[in-house]
Amino acid sequence: MSIIITDLCKTFDDNEVLKNVNITLKDNSIYCLMGTSGIGKTTLLRILMGLEHADSGSISGIDIKSVSCMFQENRLIPDLSAIDNVRIVLRGKPNRQEIRNNLLSILPDDSLDMPVNSLSGGMKRRVALARALS
């Protein structure tokens, strides 16, 4: 299934950030958004994630609830453990042991229950990635 973006427009005040954007994103493909500051890259992603609404246009072939992203900044909750930072984004009653087992493939066991603010930068990044993929 593809994500089809048709004639998408978004304006902030009098600044037209997205103007008639048309893109087809094919399933199981990797894409990269590149461009100068202020061109609308983040706005487009925020619209795809349901965090922002377009002024006009349409997006089809996507269930907003299934979209996740990894921010440039980690956006972790510093006082929570790696496990709890992943757990907080999961719906329902996530199984703590299952999260622990999944995290063990990317983090040492003794770091899983530590507050993420005590982890190295690389470890924090791995927690952020695990959360985005959850």
What residue spans do the PLM features occupy?
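Conserved structural motif at the start of ABC-family nucleotide-binding domains
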Residues: 3, 18-20
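Conserved ABC ATPase "signature" region
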Residues: 96-112
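Conserved catalytic motifs of ABC-family nucleotide-binding domains
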Residues: 74-84, 88
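Conserved ABC ATPase signature
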Residues: 115-119, 123
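Helix-to-loop junction immediately C-terminal to a conserved catalytic motif
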Residues: 49
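Hydrophobic anchor residue at the start of the ABC signature
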Residues: 129
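The feature captures the beta-strand-to-loop junction immediately N-terminal to the Walker
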Residues: 34-36
